[in-house]
Amino acid sequence: MVPSLTDCYLRLGFKVTESEEGLRIGFKPGMVHAIVKEVRNERPLTRSDAELFYEKFSTLSKGHRNLYFRIVAHGGFLPEALDFELHGLTVSDESYIESLLSGRHVELYPHNEAAYRAIMRGFKQHRIGAVVQATGTGKSYLLARYIADHAKEKILVFAPNITILDEIRKAVGFSIPQVTYRTFQSLIRNREDNRLLRADHILIDEFHHFGAEIWGGALQDVIENNSRAYVLGMSATPIRPEGMIDTVDLYFEGNLFYELTLLQAWYYNILPVPVLVQSAYGLDNKLDRLQRKLERSGCSKERKEKVQRKLDLARVDFKEALGAPEVIRKFLPTSIRKLLVFCRNLTDLKQMVPEVCGWLTQAGRTITPFEIHHAQGERQNGRILDAFREESDRLHVLFSVNMLIEGLHVEGVDAVLFLRRTESYIVTLQQLGRCLNAEAGKRPVVLDFVNNLSGKSVYDVMAPHLERLSLLPSPKGFEGNTSFLTTGFLSDIRLRIEEILAELEPWQIMYERLIEFRREENDWPSITEGKLGLWCNTQRIAYKRGKLQEER
């Protein structure tokens, strides 16, 4: 007798609640991650059928973040029924039930079901290819599904560190003797033995480092020694910041099997959009620079007095915003229990640990600090990560140098603190990705203590692209995420500072001097009138050449 779908899930350790609408499935106690509907259809399901199911399911998702839907259609389905996988609905046939009973099932979210099929299609045409997916969308589960489906063949799995390899092993869920897990660094330590490595499949996680380090050549040797093996690379950030090199083109023959960007993950509600707390940390220096600029400017006395009043008011109005403890007290919810702090290097870490701990303590938080970096060794770092993961009434604060940048999620993380500006957009997204997780079910907090008063945030840059995604067709009931929740003191402060800067802008100052000259002399300055005359002549020339801005 074939077990019921409920029994299949229970055997896998999933939490199941039966209802008229379908089965509510949870991978963790107290959470619902999916609604599964079993359908005994006589004809294959079509796109229209799937859209009707989506409309019904979407009303059930209220109050649940990142909930996905699965239809198990005993009568099969047409390929068009899979059109809504990015929106969170996938369709399966009876082979899905066979997988549940196989003892090697790896459950995938709908967006990863789409990615996995793309991998299978890609390998029908190419021996080597890559998948690019935003951090937190389940790349380790994609690799785990591939491993489980090829468990009888020899597989080599490479990743930057043991912790990432352990995450992949955990996602697989069962032991497979034909699979060999190796770090990139191990290829250097055992280079003489690398020629003995044989595989039918080579899987490379975080492939954007391929070729960037000394081990890149050793990994290339392994690939060349297995000239018939299928090679699959996974990364969230394939563009290397140095030289903006596209590693998909460079190392995977340009064969991009599937891509899911961070923008798509946000828009389609695959990842929760963090609450961005933009701090005014460092505002003192900014206001001091404005003060010096005012003193050096050629403003009229009247304008100087006007701008000085605005500066003085800004100092008074934002006095509370200058202190990091006040920002933390006001904007970091007390429900937050896991905070990641990223440091530039070990020296930076040693300086920031006491400072950040001081801020948190002054903000009224009881904390336990942890440090993870390469100087401690992998075993010690593993023990520290385990301790950080433990549940506690205290705020666990993990200070990291590089190690959590690459492909690793720590369960339960709900906040990230940015302390240093980075020139690498890629690193910024990787840091942001540490608190993004498709299974988290909650909205994380990003404390931005980088002094970015004069620049655009990642949110400012991405918002227009989200608007464009909203123009794509969607099923009834789908609501895409097209906006960000930005809070903190910064937006108001930035507006005030931009107003002051505008008043100190050289063109505006010279224009006012011109008006004053015209009023007093009832004439226009000639080129012999010094700086004002030269400036006025320059504007005339720019106007004649069509280069003067319209508003001027």
Q: What are these model-derived regions, one by one?
A:
Residues 435-462:
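Conserved segment of the helicase C-terminal RecA-like domain
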Residues 424-440:
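Conserved SF2 helicase motif VI
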Residues 256-340:
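Conserved interdomain linker/interface between the two RecA-like ATPase lobes of SF2 helicase motors
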Residues 212-274:
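Post-DEXD/H (motif II) to motif III coupling segment of the RecA-like Helicase ATP-binding lobe
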Residues 496-552:
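IQ-motif-like calmodulin-binding regions
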Residues 368-401:
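Conserved helicase ATPase core of P-loop NTP-dependent helicases/translocases
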Residues 125-146:
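Walker A/P-loop
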Residues 106-124:
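N-terminal pre-P-loop "Q-motif" helix
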